[in-house]
Amino acid sequence: GFQLTLTGYDLEMGIVTTIDANVKEPGEVVLNAKLLSSMVSRMPSGQINIQSAENGKTTIQSGVAQFEIQSMNPTDFPELPNTGAEETLNIKTGVLRDMIERTLYAVSQDEKKPAHTGELFEISPDKLTVVALDGYRLAIVERPVEAIKEIRIIVPSKTMNEVSHLLANDDEETVHISANRRYVVFTTAGYTIMSRLIE
């Protein structure tokens, strides 16, 4: 069938998801994410129709609710990076979500210490260790895993928040983690989340 791919990217983190849709005419359009989210959240549940006109106006309609939003030029949308990240680890969504939730509270908000504003992922052959600290608190969680590649990376807390939020409710689903020295990519059945790392 036809599909609709939604992409959000702020040059630090990108999120991509693909959903089934009844596509009348293939194309692409760039819409303000906050406006779009606000409109969709106010609509009744059910089918949503999106129609984009050549004058740059996009109409979003569901039931009796209808909104119009000014679209932007797709060529101005930044291209997602080719991360070159290598497959590192596969882990159950429930395990990863639990590790994030047990450590995220200890991440520093102090931008003067960038390394403390993220979570350290230490991946060794047989275990994943997630560490967060802010100078006062230290949170460490370890879980046994079978890693494909060893690596130490610092992932921004904003990314970890999104990953935790977007992980499926099915705790038995698998998250594929790929990484290199610059990027990390989390891939689930529903989403791909890519992020720059803190150096």
Language-model regions: role of each:
Residues 1-199:
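Structural preference for solvent-exposed beta-strand-turn elements
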